[in-house]
């Protein structure tokens, strides 16, 4: 086990918790998911994910490391419903479609995204990130609407704090 990668996971989980608690303290959502946040990304400690992630982020990015990371990422998104990719259905007859994400996973997903803003200290960073990445995200229309409503509420609250 790599000390660097273990520390990264711990720090990421702490920042996800910070993001979630900020949302909760500012009344951004009514639903609370405390227990869910406490087990956020626990699959990163599994055999299927830990070593491939560690090698990818802290080792040499050989073709083999990249391939193992790809399988680890696939494992991660298939075992963590806070990732939008978990809710994308691909089938032979209908092609690709997004299923609506339950609100608890949307809240966790936004907390996950926002964790990186908490790490950098720029809480506004999430808005540029979302704008840059939203076209690649396959979201059900109701999920996208909820995501954007929550992001709008976050921005409004941040703006109040600045004023």
Model-derived features with residue positions:
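Metal-dependent phosphohydrolase cores
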Residues: 1-163
């Amino acid at each position: 086990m790599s000390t660097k990668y273990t520390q990264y996971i711990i720090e990421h989980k702490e920042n996800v918790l910070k993001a979630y608690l900020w949302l909760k303290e500012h009344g951004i959502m009514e639903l609370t998911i405390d227990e869910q946040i406490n087990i956020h990304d626990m699959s990163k400690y599994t055999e299927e994910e830990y070593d491939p992630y560690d090698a990818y982020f802290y080792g040499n990015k050989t073709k083999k490391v990249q391939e193992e990371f790809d399988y680890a990422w696939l494992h991660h998104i298939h075992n963590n419903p806070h990732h939008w990719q978990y809710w994308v259905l691909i089938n032979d007859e209908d092609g690709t479609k997004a299923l609506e994400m339950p609100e608890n996973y949307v809240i966790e997903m936004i907390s996950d995204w926002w964790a990186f803003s908490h790490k950098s200290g720029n809480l506004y960073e999430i808005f540029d990130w979302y704008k840059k990445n939203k076209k690649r995200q396959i979201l059900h229309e109701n999920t996208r609407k909820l995501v954007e409503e929550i992001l709008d509420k976050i921005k409004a609250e941040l703006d109040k704090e600045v004023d």
